[in-house]
From Swiss-Prot:
Subunit and partners: Part of the gamma-tubulin complex.
Major site of localization recorded for this protein: cytoplasm
Keyword Cytoplasm included in the entry's annotation: yes
One Pfam family matching this protein: MOZART1
InterPro entries for the chain: MZT1
Protein localization: Cytoplasm, Cytoskeleton, Microtubule organizing center, Centrosome; Cytoplasm, Cytoskeleton, Spindle
UniProtKB keywords: Cytoplasm, Cytoskeleton
GO process terms (BP): gamma-tubulin complex localization
Known role: Required for gamma-tubulin complex recruitment to the centrosome.
Name of the protein: Mitotic-spindle organizing protein 1
UniProt family annotation: Belongs to the MOZART1 family.
Keyword Cytoplasm (UniProt): yes
Organism: Xenopus tropicalis
Assigned GO CC terms: centrosome; cytoplasm; gamma-tubulin ring complex; spindle
Length: 72
């Protein structure tokens, strides 16, 4: 059981480091989103393709927000 505890601690520490790097790079990713991205990459998703999808979703979201604010 101590081994599982140590493993969870290592995972938590790794995610904390990745979150700090993410913040330094100003990615705008929160812990949950970053965790999802890491899991997708671990499952073989191309990180560059994932990055492109995230950027496109952000652009679409901003466009939608802008159109909603002008329609109001």
């Amino acid at each position: 059981m101590a081994n599982a505890s140590g493993s969870m601690s290592a995972v938590r520490e790794t995610m904390d480091v990745l979150l700090e790097i993410s913040r330094l790079l100003n990615t705008g990713l929160d812990m949950e989103t970053l965790s999802i991205c890491v899991r997708l990459c671990e499952q073989g998703i191309n990180p560059e393709a994932l990055s492109s999808v995230i950027k496109e979703l952000r652009r679409a979201s901003e466009t939608l927000k802008a159109s909603e604010s002008t329609a109001s």
